[in-house]
Amino acid sequence: MKFFASCAKGLEYLLADELLALGASKATATISGVNVEGELRDAQRAVLWSRLASRVLWPLSEFDCPDEDALYAGVAELPWDAHLSVGHTLSVDAHVSGTAITHARYAAQRIKDAVVDTMRRQGLERPSVDVESPDLRLNLSLRKGRATISVDLGGGPLHRRGWRMAQNEAPLKENLAAAVLMRGGWPRAYADGGGLLDPMCGSGTLLIEGALMAADVAPGLQRYGSDLPSRWRGFDRNGWQQLVSEARERDSVGRAALKQVIHGSDMDPHAIRAAKENAQVAGVAEAIWFGVCEVGELQTPPQATGVVVCNPPYDERLAADAALYRRLGDTLQCAVPQWRASLLCGNAELAYATGLRAGKKYQLFNGAIECALIVCDPIAVPRRTPLAAPTALSEGAQMVANRLRKNLQKFKKWRAREGVECFRAYDADLPEYSAAIDVYQQADGDRRIFLHVQEYAAPATIPEADVRRRLNELLAAAREVFEVPAERVALKSRERGKGGSKYGRFEQRNEIVHVREHGALLRVNLFDYLDTGLFLDHRPLRGTMAQQSRGRRFLNLFCYTGVASVEAAVAGAASTTSVDLSGTYLQWCADNLALNGLAGSKHKLVQADALAWLEAERAHFDVIFCDPPTFSNSARAEDFDIQRAHVRLLRAAVARLAPGGVLYFSNNFRRFKLDEEGVAEFAQCEDISPRTIDPDFERHARIHRAWRLTA
């Protein structure tokens, strides 16, 4: 069985690791959460023990939902007497995007109506609504025409631990505090005898969370007490009581052994008073020392090593003044130089202002606020030790750098909303600097940034010296803006010679980088070939097909490295079939599937000429993706020309559609003209090109065209 654990953006990979450690069979990070394979007991264990999850959602139903009537009908089909007891209360949380239903509150109301009407038809008492503490809390996720109705097993936000009595302004949520502690290595540091320090502790969230982690206290124990998290009729009450009993035993042992190695201070006496009250309620007051002092007056703790955790203020008034962050960095280097630091800063600029060298950087969200988490190990290492003074950017390079920063700001909200980690940051925005810069963020390890720079052909009238200078300026600007060393920049430059401009020899590094898109892990090779293994412009189309492939048969023609197949499989496709003439690409596809734990007869790889295979095949498919090359010639197949062959190709593909199936056809031939009359003989065809272009490709929206065909 699969369930979903939601979390704040930026915590997905950390949460996946935590859920695996708690016993889940499989955990795959996606946007703002993790798809989990496990039993109901695993989900209930996550409710009790997860320090990072926001909610744990157990699915009841999933269905196509093009409009409000489909939503009502889909909910009304469920046997609500098996889920909600007579006399119990109900509440619905809804999240909608990319759908005809645009208001979440209206969607929630339609679900309530469907539940109430269904129970009335069964002769049962009408359930009441209780927004604060319902017996059954439902959750709707409605995305791109697909609805999922789930039970919120925790009954509400899991960051509420049950100990917070008072708080200062802008409190840090407990699950984000847990992430700061985990990234800082606090559990291991405590086991090794280290201390914990927060010199700006506010109401004590980081320190109290750290003490509870050290004492092995389950986050859900105090939240629920002797109550059940949910009175859903499918909830395993006996299993829950067993989990709680085990957690209480661990709680008793852990609290008794808790060492007094945690120190907190703040310049605000009211905040310290609140922190002490919270620690008292949490039962860890004896383990934490609190004191009132300004950050510059910080005293060195008795422990030789440990972890500094801190969430310095970053409201609008303080964000403009980096002096506080500089003072924090200077103080830590003097007081605890050999300690490790995990600092949640308001943004990258404020993190830089600390003067500390970050070995690792993470992007997190505190509510809607984007933050920068830096980890320094040890604190004493200076941020920079250059061998020579850095070279200032030239005027031209500075222009490119400014444009890159402008683009990054423009894409910021879109990337955060959609979870985009690989994107086009620059596409010849300044005509004299004619190149594309694609950003690939590593999905594992240190989450490093790689750049893929592809130079466009310059007019023959421009001197070669100017072409080289401009390319070097563009590279210098990109490396500065993204803080990327030269060895993580893949350059595909053009050389002039007989026959005009062409790409020169590529590096042969055989270096594979794992990236993520729509929840799928993918292998890319940035250095060895012209293409990387991932066509970024097709991102939105792949997302649409993945959503529509859940529980359906997916066919990928001219599959290349199989990215669309992998994303469909990760989204829950019943089966995938990937066809390509190239054995090299099929092996790449197989590697991508294996990377996501997808293998076996459900996911077929076929080495064949796609057109010939289609005309001989008899199986049917629900979703077909056809993205052929413009031209192709091979000793093993007849020559292919998309303009000449597309009607024959599409006719053969439409013939393989199951009833209600859909074919997505795309190509990047700029001069391609669809034979509308020829296609109309066997299919209904809609040009959907504008809907398949994300913001990072809007500058050159004709990079591809796409059509939706139905029989």
From Swiss-Prot:
The UniProt keywords, alphabetically, are: Cytoplasm, Methyltransferase, RNA-binding, rRNA processing, S-adenosyl-L-methionine, Transferase
One GO cellular component term noted in the UniProt record for this chain = cytoplasm
Q: Where in the cell is it found?
A: Cytoplasm
Q: What residue stretches are annotated with the THUMP domain?
A: 42-153
For this protein, what reaction is catalysed?
guanosine(2445) in 23S rRNA + S-adenosyl-L-methionine = N(2)-methylguanosine(2445) in 23S rRNA + S-adenosyl-L-homocysteine + H(+); guanosine(2069) in 23S rRNA + S-adenosyl-L-methionine = N(2)-methylguanosine(2069) in 23S rRNA + S-adenosyl-L-homocysteine + H(+)
Kindly name one Pfam family recorded for this protein: Methyltrans_SAM
What EC numbers are recorded for this enzyme?
A: 2.1.1.173, 2.1.1.264
What GO terms are given for molecular function?
23S rRNA (guanine(2445)-N(2))-methyltransferase activity; RNA binding; rRNA (guanine-N7-)-methyltransferase activity
Predominant location of this chain? cytoplasm
- Top-level EC class as recorded in UniProt: transferase
Disulfide feature: none
User: What protein family is recorded?
Assistant: Belongs to the methyltransferase superfamily. RlmKL family.
Function (record text) = Specifically methylates the guanine in position 2445 (m2G2445) and the guanine in position 2069 (m7G2069) of 23S rRNA.
NCBIfam families in UniProt: PRK11783.1 (NF008748)
In Swiss-Prot or TrEMBL terms, this protein is called Ribosomal RNA large subunit methyltransferase K/L
Instruction: Name its species.
Output: Xanthomonas oryzae pv. oryzae (strain PXO99A)
- Give the encoding gene's name: rlmL
